[in-house]
C-alpha cells in the first residue's frame, strides 16, 4: 500500500520527459538555414553509461568509452546531433562548455570531459549545407549545452530539427515512466527513420498499444491492419537515415547492466517504426544510470527496467513525429498535425 501511494505520487509529478530522471538536463540548438541541430544531455555528475549500435550505417564518437571493459567509469554528457559525420564536431562544443565548468575525467592536472555522441543523416532535407570551411556543429553543441534545463519542447528542434521519416517530418521525442518498484525511466530520441512511424498511409502510430493518455493523439490502432497497410514504405535507397536515442534511469547499474538496457531498448525502435535496425539506418541507443536508487531485487528489477525502457522509447518516437512541424523548404516532408489533425 505504501509503495502504491508513492508510485501514484511519482507518476503525478512526471513531465513525460527524460528529465523526470533525476540527475540530468537537456538543451537544444538549431540552425534554420542549414536545417540541422544538436541536442545535448548534461549529467550532474559522472554517470554510468553504455551503448548498443544495431543499425547498419552508424556514426558515433567516443563509444569505446561506453564498453563495460573500458577504464572510464562515467560520462559527463551525451550528444544527439544532425549532420552525419560533420555533426561529430558538436561534442567538441559540449566539451568546451564542460571544460569551462571544470568538469571531466581527471588525468593528472587536467580534465577531459567524456561526451559520447551519435548522429543522424539530415544532409538531404533541402537546407543550405554550403556552410563554408567548417560546419556549424561545434557552436551548436556549445549553445545546446548552455541551454540545458529540466524543461524542453519536442518536435522540430535540436538534433531533430532536420529529421525526417519515410513519409512525415521526424523530430525530437521524449517520454518517461515509473516501474512498479519505483524506478524512474526516461527516453530521448531523434527520429530520422528510413521507414515510417505510422501504419500505411493513415494517422495511426505503430506505437499506439503503448500510448499513455493521448500523448500522441489517442487514436489507438485502426480497426483492421490490411496487408497493404503492412507493406514496407522506406526512403528507397542508401539515403542514410538513423534513429538515435538515450534511455536513462535513476537505478544504480553497472556498465554491463547499462549495456543490456541499451540492447533491450532497441526493441522500442522496432515497436514504433517499420523499418527498424535496417542496413541503411544507424540505429543507436545509449543507456545511462544516474544511480539515485539501488536495485532491491536485481533480477526482477533489471527485467522490468528493460521492458519499461523499450515501451518508453516507442512512445518517445511517436511523440517526436506527432509534435513535429514541417521545415520551411520546398519541397519538405509534411508534419503529422498538418496532414492528419483535422480528422481528430
Predicted ranges, named:
Residues 3-7, 11-85, 89-92, 99-344:
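A structural signal for small-residue-enriched, beta-sheet-centric alpha/beta enzyme cores
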